[in-house]
């Protein structure tokens, strides 16, 4: 079975959003963000000097890779997609490209991705990795500075530390951090079923192609989602929580290739919806807008009937625990 056939029959996976934002749980100095928890640095404009100190107290003593993997497997999921690095710029694995990572910057000093890769191999699960290839708020040249509206904070780009967007050069970030880190995750953790990119903006077609070609060089069977940007993908990620009523009668290739939602041409007919169980991706302790188990099952069956995979997210807390209510729903 090739990777396209596997993906089509997989149907159901678990996404995990976990990072320094999990420590805050949606609250900063007594104020709560009304938006998604993993965007809290942007929402409150928390400067890197202060935000990065969170790493010194990130010690998730209850993290257990086998528990995460066996939980997903027991829920009938076929693959797991974990945030190796989200927009905050902090990596959950040991990165030689940037010491702002779980092993070098926290008292935990364990490579979370390595442990998850081992657990997935042991239990016969596929591992995919999310990687934010455009937004990186920890880097002065992180992308996103072409957009001014529609985000869950005060800016797509880090305008609270680096307010002059005209001085930013994404190519520096791409060459010095993005490319080296993508190469790391491709070469350090065995076979990956997919790389899940996000929010393309200033990334050029040439840069998207560089990432595409690097992935296919190291892991020819690794699938690439549409948010890599510029049409260089294997399958289409629909919008966040997008549950279409029906498939369009015709799908052409005129859609915005960098758009985050809606149907666009998929070269192998592969589609996916990533979705939350409440109203946030990263842990937010006061978000109780939970979907019912019945709604989750209805959405899964509806999407799968149309041939669309359902990638359901959990947001573990700062100690590494998947919230009990998430487990109850699934």
Task: State what each model feature region is.
Residues 1-330:
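Mature catalytic domains of secreted/periplasmic carbohydrate-active enzymes
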């Amino acid at each position: 079975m090739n990777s396209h056939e596997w993906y089509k029959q997989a149907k159901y996976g678990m996404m995990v959003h976990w990072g320094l934002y999990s420590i805050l749980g949606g609250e900063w100095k007594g104020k709560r963000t009304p938006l998604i928890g993993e965007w809290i640095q942007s929402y409150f404009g928390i400067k890197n000097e202060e935000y990065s100190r969170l790493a010194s107290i990130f010690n998730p003593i209850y993290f257990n890779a086998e528990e995460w993997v066996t939980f997903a497997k027991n829920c009938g999921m076929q693959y797991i997609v974990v945030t190796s690095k989200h927009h905050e710029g902090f990596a959950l694995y040991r990165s030689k490209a940037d010491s702002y990572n779980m092993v070098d910057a926290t008292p935990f000093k364990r490579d979370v991705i390595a442990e998850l890769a081992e657990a997935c191999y042991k239990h016969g699960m596929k591992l995919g990795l999310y990687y934010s290839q455009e937004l990186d708020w920890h880097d002065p040249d992180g992308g996103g500075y072409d957009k001014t509206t529609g985000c869950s904070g005060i800016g797509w780009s880090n305008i609270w530390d680096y307010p002059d967007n005209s001085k930013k050069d994404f190519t520096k970030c791409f060459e010095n951090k993005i490319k080296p880190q993508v190469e790391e995750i491709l070469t350090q953790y065995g076979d990956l079923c997919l790389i899940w990119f996000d929010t393309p903006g200033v990334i050029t077609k040439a840069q998207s192609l560089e990432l595409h070609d690097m992935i296919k060089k190291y892991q020819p069977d690794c699938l690439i989602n549409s948010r890599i940007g510029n049409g260089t993908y294997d399958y289409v990620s629909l919008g966040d929580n997008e549950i279409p009523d029906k498939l369009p009668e015709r799908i052409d290739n005129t859609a915005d290739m960098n758009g985050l939602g809606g149907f666009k041409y998929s070269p192998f007919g592969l589609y996916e919806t990533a979705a939350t169980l409440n109203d946030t991706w990263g842990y937010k302790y006061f978000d109780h807008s939970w979907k019912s188990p019945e709604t989750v099952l209805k959405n899964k069956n509806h999407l799968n009937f149309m041939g669309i995979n359902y990638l359901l997210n959990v947001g573990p807390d700062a100690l590494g625990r998947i919230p009990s209510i998430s487990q109850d729903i699934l």
